[in-house]
Amino acid sequence: MKLIIFTGLVLFAIVSLIEAQAENERACLPQYQVCTDAPGNCCSNLVCDCYGRYKSGTRIGRNCFCLQKGVIYKREN
């Protein structure tokens, strides 16, 4: 009985380790890629930065991109 419980715990630990490793190996989104639907998938040196789109004062959508952390982007006229 103890052997069955021990074997079950070992198998559970192995499966958990495999799942954690697969989570860490998922592909990250590179710079300037759209991250609207996946805000946590930008690569480690990037952050998912979102901007609202407006037309005549009414919000018509939202865009999110993987951008460098700490960088401020300004509109050029």
UniProtKB/Swiss-Prot annotation:
The secretion signal range is 1-20
Gene Ontology MF annotations: toxin activity
Q: How is it modified after translation?
A: Contains 4 disulfide bonds.
Q: What keywords tag this UniProt record?
A: Disulfide bond, Secreted, Signal, Toxin
Q: Which domain of life, per UniProt?
A: Eukaryota
**Pfam families of this UniProt entry?**
Toxin_35 (PF10530)
Name-wise, this protein is: U8-lycotoxin-Ls1s
Q: Which organism is it from?
A: Lycosa singoriensis (Wolf spider)
